[in-house]
Amino acid sequence: MYMARCGPKNNVLCFPFQLSFLFSKRLINKRFKYTLQTEDEKDMMGSLSKNKIITPEDVEFKLAQLREFSNTLKERIHNTKSVNSDGHQSNSIAPISEDSRNVNVTKISSVPNEEKSKNLSDLIHSSFLEKMDHLVPKVIRERVADDDILAKNLFDRSHSNWAPVIDRLYVSEKRFMDIDSREFSVWLNGTVKYLPFHSILHLDEMLLEQINGDVVKFNTHMYECIFNNLGNLKPTNFNQDGTNDKVILKMKELLERYDKALKITEERINKKEGFPSKVPKMTQAILNNCLKYSTKCSSFHDMDYFITKFRDDYGITPNKQNLTTVIQFYSRKEMTKQAWNTFDTMKFLSTKHFPDICTYNTMLRICEKERNFPKALDLFQEIQDHNIKPTTNTYIMMARVLASSSSNAVVSEGKSDSLRLLGWKYLHELEDKNLYRHKKDDLNLFLAMMVLAAFDGDIELSRALYYLFIAKKYKTLCANWKGNILVDQDTIWKSTLMPEMLNYLMLAYARFDPRNLPVLSGYEKGIELRRKFLREFDSSMRLDDTDKLVKFKLPFLPISDLNSEAQVLAESNAIWSFNLENGGTRNTLTSSNEAALEDIKKYRQLLDSFAQEAEDFNEFKFKVMYEVTKMQRESINVNVFNKISLHTYLSIPINLKQQKEFLRRLTFFTFQQHEFEAVIKRLYEGYRNIPSSHTRDQNSISTEAISVSKPETTEDLNLIMHDIWYITCLRHKIMMDTTLYELVMKAAIEFQNEDLAKKVWNDRGKFRTTVPFLKMDQRIRIAKDQKFAHLMVEFFTKQGKYSDAIAIILSSKNRFNWTYSMVRNLHKALEEIEDRNSVEILLDVVNKKSHAKALKWEEQELNM
């Protein structure tokens, strides 16, 4: 351990206490890390012969040494400061004033030191000067005139923040004036990054001022710096489509400036005023930043504008990086056909444009969405044939593609288990290769294993993976938490719980089948891997009971093997509620009668004020919807409560054939748009028609009038109370959409519940008249209608009502594209009863050869 003497000395430059302690802390950390590393290496060498393991107690002992040393050093620096201020003026130099902060201190620090070793202040000062020389030019440091800002925001390069530095330069007197623009701009482009939009505007203004507004002198490095910072920005939530986006407009303004510079240069050449020494040029990096931000906005129009602009005006065609960005955009927008076309173009354009591993990983992600495992296998073979080195994410994506493809018997060609087995083989290969893993790869790896285990219905492994990942993340957050862990449990759990992990755990519950054996139990390597996770899960559950530092519990049943449907339903409900209530830190889903009455009273007054303040019904509706959203964010973990996870959660009782539990979950966690609008309208009209209590006190109303209207008023108030409770419960509900209506129809098919089928048919018909449905793209609306019609045909087929099923097909034959796969079950049923006439009509619709008999059938139905 290194120690430093900190007593008062001659010729010592004194820094402010906070700055001195900051630098000393960094220096000590550096030295301590080196000491630990040296000692650890010695311990490791010794452990080869002694089999000695470094225990947590040893690490804690070293950390205690560091804390004690830091406290001692802090006290000595404080004592030195006190001694200097009390009377040792002859042995010290006064603290640096604001005016003299940026004096050339190199001369001062170069005073001959007669002692052999420098004191701590000398080391701090020399380290500060050396690091500053690498961070900012000397002239910039002088104009910032605040070493504290530079040290605080720039010393940690992994978290450097240039915004305060740029803003400080913006308010300085000289800014960038009288600085060599070429040398300065080279440094600027490679250093200043991740500025907010207002700081980018300040930087652009100062650069223009530096060249006296001559846009011809605005060189390539300046353009690249500005575009790089613009490309790293994120669009605002209310402007995701890029319409009139301020960043897009700024990019176009810069391109107009460049066009103006080219025009001025051409005019100067024609007038023989001299050719500029260096004309700025547009680059591939600038194009990529334009495309990167356009894809964040999901703006196809802007992306096409930039590609066309650079190609036609500047002769710059998209390179490999640009095309990869375009493919990623297509992937996010579900434009898979365009993505495949662009990918094929890259392969056959030239060797410079040939896809790299990043592009292949993007295409594998598209294969996962399409459940196209044959194409994914072809892509992986291409990677090997072209000697492209796969990354960790490549193997993870292959496992995910095979897992998602195995979920459908038709897609998997009846080989679901084989696909999942192959997916595990890719993960084994990843483990054997020991490739570099980014910290995000651990999450992706856990998710890949969760996907494979979930689609396999392996509840035991899914529980273990979920528990181990959430426990690791929770304890890591607690270990690094700067606040009070007990007080901040709500925030910690919100950062810990993940919607993807919850969704795959719910999927494992939904695919529960005690008769099936996991695919991992079929070979030795799989058995070892599965036992490893189950063993860690079991030991973690036991050890956490004695962990007094960080208490961590998940509401799993205290049994290692779930073997009944009741257990699956109970545990899935517990885990679901635990996630929605943010790790048990909120009490939203279970409330007492007293609490419910308090909520009704509170929101009755609030809704009353909304109704009185609103100018019309639309304003009242907006206020209520805003309040519901606010209420939901305050009481529910909205990160995990989404339509995808809810869909999976509702599918559990369907697959387990538990109709009562399904209806309970559906009613408790969903609401319908038309019902919501009816309740809002009743409340608005009720508040408008019934005078407030204050108004009734002022008006003279006879006792007889009150008694006559009392029964009606009581009934109306009961209805209002019911409607207010409906609004209050929306905090844990999600609006029904086309996907959820399809799920309810699947439940009606599974349970053979005709009443449920009729209800969902009518409810969806009302939903089709609401704004959310009408706002959907027409092609999507038709596709959703066709999917629901197909489910209705399946329901009537299973009910044996073949005439009703055929009637649905005939009534929609001109609107929907009926294929044989959609009517296969109906066709088989008609063949079994030997209804040749209906079979012929059905096949005519599917094959679209002739609609004559179909029309005849319609005529017969109408006559009947």
Swiss-Prot record:
Transit peptide, residues from-to: 1-76
PPR repeat ranges, renumbered to this chain: 319-353, 356-390
Compartment(s) of residence: Mitochondrion
Keywords for this protein: Mitochondrion, mRNA processing, mRNA splicing, Repeat, Transit peptide
GO CC annotation, single: mitochondrion
Gene3D superfamilies to which the protein is assigned, alphabetical: Tetratricopeptide repeat domain
Top-rank lineage group of the source organism: Eukaryota
GO BP terms in the entry: mitochondria-nucleus signaling pathway; mRNA processing; RNA splicing
Any one Pfam family match given in the protein's UniProt record, by short name: PPR_2
InterPro entries in the cross-refs: Pentatricopeptide_rpt, TPR-like_helical_dom_sf
Functional description taken from the UniProt entry: Regulates mitochondrial small subunit maturation by controlling 15S rRNA 5'-end processing. Localizes to the 5' precursor of the 15S rRNA in a position that is subsequently occupied by mS47 in the mature yeast mtSSU. Uses structure and sequence-specific RNA recognition, binding to a single-stranded region of the precursor and specifically recognizing bases -6 to -1. The exchange of Ccm1 for mS47 is coupled to the irreversible removal of precursor rRNA that is accompanied by conformational changes of the mitoribosomal proteins uS5m and mS26.
Miscellaneous comment text of the record: Involved in mitochondrial-nuclear incompatibility, a major determinant in reproductive isolation between species, through hybrid incompatibility of Ccm1 and its interacting partner 15S rRNA between yeast species.
Family to which the UniProt record says this protein belongs: Belongs to the CCM1 family.
Complex formation: Binds to mitochondrial small subunit 15S rRNA.
Protein's name in the database: Mitochondrial 15S rRNA processing factor CCM1
Name of the gene encoding the protein in the UniProt record: CCM1
